[in-house]
Curated annotation (Swiss-Prot):
Chain ranges of the Fe2OG dioxygenase domain: 157-257
Pathway: Alkene biosynthesis; ethylene biosynthesis via S-adenosyl-L-methionine; ethylene from S-adenosyl-L-methionine: step 2/2
This enzyme's EC code(s): 1.14.17.4
Binding-site residues for Fe cation, renumbered to this chain: 181, 183, 238
Organism: Doritaenopsis sp. (Moth orchid)
Annotated InterPro entries: DIOX_N, IPNS-like_FE2OG_OXY, IPNS-like_sf, Oxoglu/Fe-dep_dioxygenase_dom, Plant_2OG-oxidoreductases
GO molecular function, one term: L-ascorbic acid binding
Highest taxon of the lineage: Eukaryota
Pfam families cross-referenced by the UniProt entry: 2OG-FeII_Oxy, DIOX_N
Protein name: 1-aminocyclopropane-1-carboxylate oxidase 1
Oxidoreductase in keyword set: yes
PROSITE patterns: FE2OG_OXY
Length: 327
């Protein structure tokens, strides 16, 4: 499928007379795509260049040889295993909130650590700006989504970054870079390689390429936003296709609810939908603790999301649906 209509949102347009058109594009992207690209998002190109440099150098120095050894063993045994259960990627994970583990990751030099800390702060700010834009689009009080995400005992979201490399694969017809899945969390910000493609999303039954654009940030709607919006926004199946040439860098940052935050459809949206349809209020999704969902997701990541939502109904918690204060 052609990617020419893929939604690209220029955040500069949100500041002027073209704001209504830009907000309409944002709504369409969240409701009908689940994934879109941001330009002029406020993170400097200089910082993004440093992030790319330090991570590609880290992979070359410390992870490339390890992956080659893993790949050799994998290719030797691929005939005897189910390739649909394999991912052709080299990854490590940085935690930022509620506590950071950057100082504990082996082999990261000081430049890499400080660069990634700086990048994480910028991404955290961008995620929160985007959440407020989504509140505006949805007709929710400003700050509502952040308040839900920070509704756990420590008053913080869960925020972390998955740093991935997808090296050349000699048998891309057998092994995916990363198998198809939706993301479990809230809002995902991806800084992807602009020289090597591979990211695809499922749109109208067809896989469509997400075009690499230099210095853009790809935004992905996670399962929790689907729940909070009572299905108005949708998380989307996406995957990474292994390539025979080029090493693809992918830096995905996940701004998620706190582990014990309670997730449920926003009452204002449920009521609004009922009024528009002139029917009784109906919460399509259950109320649950985010960590309970994650515990299930870890086992069911590469399966359909709908059974996960259904499974959460069996442990649905009883709670008051009073408005969440945002001030």
């Amino acid at each position: 499928m052609e990617s020419g209509s893929f939604p690209v949102i220029n955040m500069e347009l949100l500041q002027g007379s073209q704001r209504p058109a830009a907000m309409a594009l944002l709504r369409d992207a969240c409701e009908n795509w689940g994934l879109y690209e941001l330009l002029n998002h406020g993170i400097s190109h200089e910082l993004m260049n440093r992030v790319e440099t330090v991570n590609k150098e880290h992979y070359r120095r410390f992870r490339e040889q390890r992956f080659k050894e893993f790949a050799s063993k994998t290719l030797d045994t691929v005939e005897n295993v189910e390739p649909e259960n394999l991912d052709w990627e080299s990854t490590f994970f940085l935690r930022h909130l509620p506590t950071s583990n950057i100082s504990q990751i082996p082999d990261l030099d000081d430049d890499c650590r400080s660069t990634m800390k700086e990048f994480a702060l910028e991404l955290e700010n961008l995620a929160e700006r985007l959440l407020d834009l989504l509140c505006e689009d949805l007709g929710l009080e400003k700050g509502y989504l952040k308040k839900v995400f920070c509704g756990g005992s420590d008053g913080l979201p869960t925020f972390g970054t998955k740093v991935s490399n997808y090296p050349p694969c000699p048998k891309p017809e057998l092994i995916k870079g990363l198998r198809a899945h939706t993301d479990a969390g809230g809002i995902i910000l991806l800084f992807q390689d602009d020289k090597v493609s591979g990211l695809q999303l499922l749109k109208d039954g067809e896989w469509i390429d997400v075009p690499p654009v230099r210095h853009s940030i790809v935004v992905n709607i996670g399962d929790q936003l689907e729940v909070i919006t009572n299905g108005k926004y949708k998380s989307v199946l996406h995957r990474v296709v292994a390539q025979t040439d080029g090493n693809r860098m992918s830096i995905a940052s996940f701004y998620n609810p706190g582990s014990d935050a309670v997730i449920f459809p926003a009452p204002a949206l449920v009521e609004k939908e009922a009024e528009e349809k002139e029917e009784k209020k109906k919460e399509i999704y259950p109320k649950f603790v985010f960590q309970d969902y994650m515990n299930l997701y870890i086992r069911k990541k590469f399966e359909a999301k709908e059974p996960r939502f259904e499974a959460m109904k069996s442990m649905e918690i009883v709670m008051s649906s009073q408005p969440i204060p945002t001030a």
